[in-house]
Amino acid sequence: MSASPLLDNQCDHLPTKMVDLTMVDKADELDRRVSDAFLEREASRGRRITQISTECSAGLACKRLADGRFPEISAGGKVAVLSAYIYIGKEILGRILESKPWARATVSGLVAIDLAPFCMDFSEAQLIQALFLLSGKRCAPIDLSHFVAISISKTAGFRTLPMPLYENGTMKCVTGFTITLEGAVPFDMVAYGRNLMLKGSAGSFPTIDLLYDYRPFFDQCSDSGRIGFFPEDVPKPKVAVIGAGISGLVVANELLHAGVDDVTIYEASDRVGGKLWSHAFRDAPSVVAEMGAMRFPPAAFCLFFFLERYGLSSMRPFPNPGTVDTYLVYQGVQYMWKAGQLPPKLFHRVYNGWRAFLKDGFYERDIVLASPVAITQALKSGDIRWAHDSWQIWLNRFGRESFSSGIERIFLGTHPPGGETWSFPHDWDLFKLMGIGSGGFGPVFESGFIEILRLVINGYEENQRMCPEGISELPRRIASEVVNGVSVSQRICHVQVRAIQKEKTKIKIRLKSGISELYDKVVVTSGLANIQLRHCLTCDTNIFQAPVNQAVDNSHMTGSSKLFLMTERKFWLDHILPSCVLMDGIAKAVYCLDYEPQDPNGKGLVLISYTWEDDSHKLLAVPDKKERLCLLRDAISRSFPAFAQHLFPACADYDQNVIQHDWLTDENAGGAFKLNRRGEDFYSEELFFQALDTANDTGVYLAGCSCSFTGGWVEGAIQTACNAVCAIIHNCGGILAKGNPLEHSWKRYNYRTRN
């Protein structure tokens, strides 16, 4: 017997008008309004079912209810329904709203997910990660700006993913339902609005290991020009700063502004800046060779604070591989990688796999590890708790992996990001050559996986810039600043410090000349090798606690070598040659740098060799720079003769126009930068927090990039400098500005991981 006319009418024309919530911009209000919409829809449907069932002569509700898709009653029983959300962009939402009927809108193939748009435990980046893992489709934030709330039958097919929320093992099980129009997946659209999940901010954000943002503290102190001060009745300390690198100069400068007028800086070399060293060529002083730090990401917020303060914020993009035309040489075969395009096909698997890992994270056995992009997004949006807990899970699972073994575990496993399993050793070698954005990482494959991952999460591998004036202009300008009638540079003594010892309540500094001086406080920024071998600070526990001594003695310092060549012309522009070359021979990475873009006839600069670790160590056997240049030129000519024929110094002057440096044999450095081996991240923790340990304050404080979580980056040097200054002001009775690192409630990690 056929159903009544009312039943047929309801089955074909059940109203599906959605509730418009686009004006709601508060999460708690959106939560309430969405709940009300679901309740009203269910109540409305219940009334209709009762009415229709009463009129149905068979006593059974029509299975085409709710526009023919939503079976509320089957065999006399009500089918359970769930709430879910389809995330879409504004354009797709408009098409849905304009469609008549809405069922013809482009929703087929989309995934509904049980994460609400007012959920504050998840960020937008995590949503992108979850949707990709559930659907295999990539989304950009603009594609997820809006949502449609739906009721969906529990009989619909679904897939569940375990996504971590808390470090104690608690996970959020995220369920997705694929929407199809043909397969009678029963669902009903209820409401629509804007996605209010946490989004990244445009300002600064903290680094993952610290979860404290130093930039707002510096910004806040800009008006007063100081991070602390001493009341009139409080005596000011006599302070020594060991090392006139960027960290030591920031320490001295900030102490002077805080009112400490007895500050002496000891510098063993004849220049200031440390690893911020820009060599200017005699015949072209505007062309500079960055012998140390040369790439500066905008995410280095403290660095850019000081660059802006001293009028040096005008930066240009660094010519990293793929951002400019890049020549790749692998096993003697040449490949061209055009700027801004995909790399050659040979490299697609590793290129796509690494980028998929950044966006999608890693699915391993029982858990989805948060993607680096999602963690960065959480830092930007202020979701510190989730960022902390996600990072702790990475530490627990990968803390004892080298970068090499971590890559193997991720890309040779059952769920490789990008969907393609890498081959060994072929893809290994390709990845070593190509790297993760700033060139090949092959020489540091045995460093810790976590050490490399933190650089990515902190944003240090993105949008790297170069300083047109040369980065050593920053320490020069700090040193030339006059405070209370005396410049910082006038307080520098160019002499080596041989020993630092406790002497009752004072700290004794013994110089190479044999002279000794007593100080109330000492900040040591001279690097780990000097701390151990020259200053003899780790011989006992009179100054540092045993774990700090262990970290100083055992932290790994990376070897690095650079050789620059100033050429008569910018030959790569004259002859339309790529300005970046990556090779698997001894040259490794070659960069053509233009410091005079306004002058097409100006001199060219080529960083003909930038190597790390074993590749750098080999070059130590050829200390003569002319011989080393000839060796490198010959190696390049075998694969790229059209490029190599231009690698001769301007005016054939090897003495003035070729410069090289090996950081491992630099007696004042003992290495280029700290790079933790696997399982050694707790060394960074001991070194970084030493100055903030007020319970064990001996008057000697560590600072410098090697005492931070980001060895080799200026950011860590400035952060630790701030720590030391705050410790001195606080310990000596001064008053610090609010929001300083000493009063911050640090949320520490467990770096002694269990894997």
From Swiss-Prot:
Binding site for substrate: R295
Cofactor(s) annotated in UniProt: FMN
Binding site for FMN: S247, E267, K275, R295
Pfam family, one: Amino_oxidase
Cofactor annotation remark: Binds 1 FMN per subunit.
Reaction(s) the record says it catalyses: L-tryptophan + O2 = indole-3-acetamide + CO2 + H2O
EC class name: oxidoreductase
Pathway note: Plant hormone metabolism; auxin biosynthesis
EC number: 1.13.12.3
Source domain of life: Bacteria
GO biological process: amino acid catabolic process; auxin biosynthetic process
Keywords from the named record: Auxin biosynthesis, Crown gall tumor, Flavoprotein, FMN, Monooxygenase, Oxidoreductase, Plasmid
GO molecular function: L-amino-acid oxidase activity; tryptophan 2-monooxygenase activity
Note: The sequence shown is that of Ach5.
Family recorded in the similarity comment: Belongs to the tryptophan 2-monooxygenase family.
Protein's name according to its UniProt entry: Tryptophan 2-monooxygenase
Source organism of the structure: Rhizobium radiobacter
Lineage, top ranks: Bacteria, Pseudomonadati, Pseudomonadota, Alphaproteobacteria, Hyphomicrobiales
